[in-house]
Each structure stands twice: as C-alpha cells, then as structure tokens.
C-alpha cells in the first residue's frame, strides 16, 4: 500500500528513475527485506529503506498480515527530513 504523500513524491521523480523505483517497490511484495535494505534507527516505527541510485524508498512491514506500506520516496538529500 502507498501513503498519499508517497504517491505525490513519486509523481515528482525524474522520468528516468521512475521505472527503476516502481520495479524495486514491486519486488518488495516478494521479498520485503532484499539485500542492501536497512532498518532505520531513531524512529518509534519499524521502518526500512532501500536504495535505488541516489533515491530512497522508506517503508514499513507488517509481517503478520504480509503488507508492505510505502511511506516516502525521494532523493537521498531530502528523504530523511
């Protein structure tokens, strides 16, 4: 599932990056913790991130019901603010 904010952020991404990011997000449904993913520290929530070049996808995982919730998508310099 996608937060509304994540959908808006995706619409502002460069068109050259969009297919790569969409493909990476799609792969999360099969493997929510792919190689290179990292659990984020300093948050009360169980948040993870994947890297796609200079872009990041921040998401949460609900293992009990097998749902990946996309929280934020953006350039690495902006995503953690």
Predicted segments — roles?
Residues 1-51, 62-69, 79-81:
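Basic, Lys/Arg-enriched alpha-helical interface segments
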Residues 54:
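Glycine-rich phosphate-binding loop
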Residues 74:
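Residues forming the ATP-binding cleft of Hanks-type serine/threonine protein kinase domains
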């Amino acid at each position: 599932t996608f937060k509304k904010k994540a959908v808006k952020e995706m619409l502002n991404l460069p068109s050259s990056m969009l297919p790569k990011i969409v493909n990476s997000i799609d792969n999360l449904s099969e493997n929510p913790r792919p190689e290179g993913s990292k659990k984020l520290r300093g948050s009360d929530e169980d948040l993870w991130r994947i890297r796609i070049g200079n872009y990041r996808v921040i998401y949460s995982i609900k293992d009990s019901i097998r749902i990946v919730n996309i929280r934020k998508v953006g350039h690495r310099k902006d995503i953690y603010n």
